[in-house]
Amino acid sequence: MVVLFIISFYTNNQEIASPPVAFFAPFSLAAIDLIYNVDKWRVELKNNTYLIMLVGSLCFLGAVYFARAGKVFLRSGRFEQNRFKSTIEPEELNYIKVGRINCWIFAALQVITFVLCLIAVMRISRRFGISGSLSILISGYKNLKSFTTENISLGRLNNNLYDFCYASGFIWFYIVANNFAVSKKVDKLPLLNLILSIAISLEKGSRGGAVTLLVAGVAMMVIIWQKKSKRRRLKFRQILLVILIAVIVVGTFQKVGELLGRVSAADFGGYLSTYLSAPIRNLDYYINNVMGRSFSRPDVWGKMTFVRMINFLGGFLKIDSWVYELDLPFLRSNGYVCGNVYTTFYAYLYDFGVTGVIVLMILMGLISQVLYQKATKPSKRNRRYSINLWIIVYSYVFYSLAFSFFSNKFYEGIVSIQFMKYLVFWAMVRYFVERTKFKAVSFKRI
């Protein structure tokens, strides 16, 4: 993984937001961290594991290069010698002026949503006999979501408001990043709305939404900086800022979990390794101790890979067998907890075997590279709006690629009704921000 990261980094002109770098950089960190835990967990990866990860990774990388070469061919009618040149095209960025009234109206909506959802979470937790502090109630709701078949929905209105406000966070992050790149100043009201979106994402007890938004935001910042500065490579101080943001996110990960009621007995290093390198160890266990002994196709096609869409269709069509929990057993090694995540390869192997790894990794590479090229290319359609939705869409995909070392984020996230809702919500918020104007009302003395 480290070698593939180095190759992809330099053949992609050191564009750190490109799909191969997004995929291989975190996987490389996970592999390095696994070396640190070899004795602790008594890890001895088998050749089967190495081979499956290598084949899948090469399929992904090959698909990315094919998509890049295809872009060159479609433009010129022939393959150029330098087919790996930068896909980032410079663009004159405009300061996105958001009306103060627009910002305050949206902030008020988010505060109302925060209160409504928090009341609903507390009420549901107490209904199931959970009592205590706010963090205990939120943690209790998270556990109910994970381990009960009872209806614990916040209600259609609350859920839609929750999703809408969370999705708006991507727009607000884009505005903050764009305006900072243009003016070197932080736009305070959009930043306030961004903070509210992050706060709302934590109400259900999960840190995943906040992490998604922050990682996607970093991708937006990088692409916007590169387009604005007309540089393929980031300046050293910009790279340091990206690293600093990553360190802050990682450093506060356990503490945020504790605030949400998720207490762990492990030290910070062990806690982090459970999320970072344990998935590779768990994948090795599955390949050589479960799959190697008795592999059988699941009862539902694409059960693990397309779980979000299948669950939605099952509920919508009233097909009980399509509503299920993921098959992710918790594992331990040498007495240490290794969690229940198995990298992105697990879902493909579980559903379709080695053939699934090859086909789905190729599709992942093609889709992500095409979206990256859309995000980094100026479009005439984008001139109607200052906010480029392609950058936001790719930033969401960037997160799913970056967390492939963890689980099947790509197909879970993209092939889902939730992603379709986000597309609609992003368009709605963009219209509200850029096209809806309010005039201040003045009251004159009669």
Residue ranges of predicted features:
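A structural signal for hydrophobic alpha-helical transmembrane segments in multi-pass membrane proteins
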Residues: M1-R123, M428
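Hydrophobic cores of alpha-helical transmembrane segments in multi-pass inner/ER membrane proteins
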Residues: M1-V3, L54-R75, Y166-I175, L214-M220, ...
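Hydrophobic, aromatic-rich transmembrane alpha-helices
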Residues: V2-S8, Y166-A181, V359-K377
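Conserved luminal/periplasmic juxtamembrane motif of membrane-embedded glycan-processing enzymes
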Residues: I7-S8, N13-A17, W41-V43, G205, ...
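Membrane-interface helix-loop-helix junctions at transmembrane boundaries of multi-pass membrane enzymes
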Residues: N13-S18, Y174-P190, K374-I392
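Membrane-embedded catalytic interface detector for glycan/lipid assembly enzymes
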Residues: R75-L234, Q238-I239, A246-L260, F443-I446
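Small-residue-enriched transmembrane helix-hairpin modules in multi-pass membrane proteins
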Residues: S135-N159, I248-S368
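Hydrophobic alpha-helical segments
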Residues: N340-I446
